[in-house]
From Swiss-Prot:
<keyword id="KW-0808">Transferase</keyword>
<protein>
    <recommendedName>
        <fullName>Anthocyanidin 3-O-glucosyltransferase 4</fullName>
        <ecNumber>2.4.1.115</ecNumber>
    </recommendedName>
</protein>
<comment type="similarity">
    <text>Belongs to the UDP-glycosyltransferase family.</text>
</comment>
<feature type="binding site">
    <location>
        <position position="124"/>
    </location>
    <ligand>
        <name>UDP-alpha-D-glucose</name>
    </ligand>
</feature>
<keyword id="KW-0328">Glycosyltransferase</keyword>
<dbReference type="InterPro" id="IPR002213">
    <property type="entry name" value="UDP_glucos_trans"/>
</dbReference>
<feature type="binding site">
    <location>
        <position position="104"/>
    </location>
    <ligand>
        <name>UDP-alpha-D-glucose</name>
    </ligand>
</feature>
<feature type="binding site">
    <location>
        <position position="123"/>
    </location>
    <ligand>
        <name>UDP-alpha-D-glucose</name>
    </ligand>
</feature>
<feature type="binding site">
    <location>
        <position position="143"/>
    </location>
    <ligand>
        <name>UDP-alpha-D-glucose</name>
    </ligand>
</feature>
<dbReference type="GO" id="GO:0009718">
    <property type="term" value="P:anthocyanin-containing compound biosynthetic process"/>
</dbReference>
<dbReference type="InterPro" id="IPR035595">
    <property type="entry name" value="UDP_glycos_trans_CS"/>
</dbReference>
<feature type="binding site">
    <location>
        <position position="122"/>
    </location>
    <ligand>
        <name>UDP-alpha-D-glucose</name>
    </ligand>
</feature>
<feature type="binding site">
    <location>
        <position position="144"/>
    </location>
    <ligand>
        <name>UDP-alpha-D-glucose</name>
    </ligand>
</feature>
<dbReference type="Pfam" id="PF00201">
    <property type="entry name" value="UDPGT"/>
</dbReference>
<comment type="function">
    <text>In the presence of other necessary color factors, this glycosylation reaction allows the accumulation of anthocyanin pigments.</text>
</comment>
<comment type="pathway">
    <text>Pigment biosynthesis; anthocyanin biosynthesis.</text>
</comment>
<dbReference type="GO" id="GO:0047213">
    <property type="term" value="F:anthocyanidin 3-O-glucosyltransferase activity"/>
</dbReference>
Amino acid sequence: CNKLKLDKAERGDKASVDNTELLKWLDLWEPGSVIYACLGSISGLTSWQLAELGLGLESTNQPFIWVIREGEKSEGLEKWILEEGYEERKRKREDFWIRGWSPQVLILSHPAIGAFFTHCGWNSTLEGISAGVPIVACPLFAEQFYNEKLVVEVLGIGVSVGVEAAVTWGLEDKCGAVMKKEQVKKAIEIVMDKGKEGEERRRRAREIGEMAKRTIEEGGSSYLDMEMLIQYVSERSPSRA
């Protein structure tokens, strides 16, 4: 499951980027040097909050992939990108943007990825854990704050951006600042740090990633759970009545 590049690329929706081009770009960078930033398919951030994220990513001086979902391509964000010269600076830095759906599993499994900046949705959390990648946690609403605690406080494989309040759906403009560029920069720098604490976090992430992969192999807990589910459904199928 998800061992072949094609399987990884086709997980979820159709990617909005050429996978060959994406992999060629990733191959340019040293192992563990690239930040992958994606805040899910229903992110509720305003254009100025997305601008803070973009500036924070830029200020780390690390290569990064930034996923801008269709709903996030607002007029305000596009105006800011053009007026502030952000896209021109992006071309000079050679960062990679994905506008739309991202082949997330394919990206996270590449050795160049050193950190996953995520909203901590459960699917993304599991994909980050399974890939063995340290997480920068930026929860926005609902159970994402519990998932943040899991990766930061329980598993010890992540760092929190410091979001203190949930984004209320439909009232994003009234929620105030979720994060500032300085918070983004600081959290990423902690995760990417080459010191003892950073190395231990990466070791833990790799170790837990291997544990997660074993659960879906034959005899693993998830493998057995799926077998039991299939058996349960089959035994109750009308055709067997």
